[in-house]
Amino acid sequence: MRKSFEKFLARQEALARQYGEAYEEKQHNRGKLTARERIEFLFDEGTFEEVDAYSPSATTSFGKTVRSYGDGVITGFGNINGRQVFAYSQDFNVQGGSLGSVHAAKIIKVQDMALKTGSPVVGLIDSGGARIQ
């Protein structure tokens, strides 16, 4: 049990490093909110529940392997004006926000969850296109 918890803490730390101050500054210098800031702005305070935050991704781009958690998209659900809504917010700082296999699977998962509950889906797009893997 302790090992599992230590792995979880290591993932939390890696995710926090992935979205550090340099990342925020880069987005703000472009006149953009970060993917997480867009989610926080959209949903009623404290209601957003992220889905698959720790989905691992390892893609090769220009001969370099890029490892990240979440694969450049934040997915989940929460309330907007008290109504349940599902959403995804693409992160341009991870592979240009491009759509890869893990990224697409996360979006499809929240779309399926929304369909089952009769809830709307909001997509916050900040993407350079698709990764053809």
Regions found by a protein language model. Give the residues of each.
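Terminal-region recognition feature
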Residues: 1-133
